[in-house]
Regions:
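N-terminal basic/disordered segments at the start of proteins
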Residues: 15-17
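A short, Lys/Arg-enriched amphipathic alpha-helix followed by its capping loop at the start of a domain
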Residues: 19-29
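Short internal beta-strands
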Residues: 29-37
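Generic N-terminal amphipathic, Lys/Arg-enriched alpha-helix
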Residues: 1-9
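An N-terminal domain-cap segment
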Residues: 43-45
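Small-residue-rich beta-alpha loop regions that form the catalytic core of phosphotransfer
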Residues: 9-13, 37-39, 49-98
Length: 98
């Protein structure tokens, strides 16, 4: 399973997230959406997208795909502390230090 962790404030409507999931599913991977920064503002997640918390599925993931900026990548990494899983970041931010 691959967890896709978007920042819904950067990936508006989760367009890139949906495309990434379509590609991964077509390649035979199961995917789950675990948004970063959306816990307090559920209205930013489209109604047709089912989500779960990253900490609930991280131990079953073969990879984490983070879509957002440096802050999104750092937030996901904090949630994954102690879990041995690779993280791939797709930069949608403005800094790009990571």
């Amino acid at each position: 399973m691959i967890a896709v962790c978007p920042n819904p404030f950067r990936d508006i409507g989760l367009k890139l997230t949906r495309e990434a999931m379509r590609i991964l599913n077509a390649a035979g991977y199961d995917t789950v959406v675990c948004p970063v920064f959306a816990e307090d503002e559920p209205d930013v997640i489209p109604d047709d997208v089912q989500t779960t918390d990253l900490t609930r599925v991280s131990d079953r993931c073969s990879m984490i795909l983070v879509i957002g900026g440096d802050g999104t990548l750092l937030a996901a990494a904090r949630k994954l502390h102690g879990i041995d899983v690779p993280i791939l970041g797709v930069n949608l931010g403005t800094k790009g230090f990571m």
